[in-house]
Amino acid sequence: MPDELRAEKSFPSKPYDSLKNKSEFDKVYQKGFKKHNPFFSLFVLDLSKEPPKEKEGFKDPLSCRLKDKKALYLLGLSVSKKVGNAVKRNLIKRRLRSLTLKHAALCQGLALVFVPRSDCYHLDFWALEKHFLEMLTSIKNYMNKALKGLKKGMTHTYAKQ
């Protein structure tokens, strides 16, 4: 078969990398900013603002993964069985992944964790996108205010719920 007729077998690479284990999720839950609505909770940790604290022989795994793999952001999806059966859970995960792909520029340098609730299944893609953008912009605004406060000497605060 001629080379020009062969289909390209490689897929384009994803701009994100996924959170893999409990310790990575826990770091985002504990150190990140959180925002809740009736459909899902969003936890965001800004990895680009704070430099990784390195001890001897230890590197911060989240910050290193952004630099090493050339990923723009890290994504974690925590969809409980309470949300619905496997078909519903997978639909929600596909929608959330495509949302972050669509708005990858907004997510750059962040570690995001979505925790959908059972009402999330009944939202269509555009309503889900609207809620996601509202929550992400409010968290980013709050993070910028907190960063300015840290420069003035305030302590770290979390986003209000």
From Swiss-Prot:
The keyword tRNA processing applies. GO terms for molecular function: 3'-tRNA processing endoribonuclease activity; ribonuclease P activity; tRNA binding. One of its GO terms (cellular component) is ribonuclease P complex. Coiled coil: none annotated. The keyword Hydrolase applies. Consists of a catalytic RNA component (M1 or rnpB) and a protein subunit. Belongs to the RnpA family. One of its GO terms (biological process) is tRNA 5'-leader removal. Residues 1-20 are annotated as: Disordered. This is Ribonuclease P protein component. It catalyses: Endonucleolytic cleavage of RNA, removing 5'-extranucleotides from tRNA precursor. PANTHER family: RIBONUCLEASE P PROTEIN COMPONENT (PTHR33992:SF1). InterPro entries: Ribosomal_Su5_D2-typ_SF, Ribsml_uS5_D2-typ_fold_subgr, RNase_P, RNase_P_CS. Keywords: Endonuclease, Hydrolase, Nuclease, RNA-binding, tRNA processing. RNaseP catalyzes the removal of the 5'-leader sequence from pre-tRNA to produce the mature 5'-terminus. It can also cleave other RNA substrates such as 4.5S RNA. The protein component plays an auxiliary but essential role in vivo by binding to the 5'-leader sequence and broadening the substrate specificity of the ribozyme. Its EC number is 3.1.26.5.
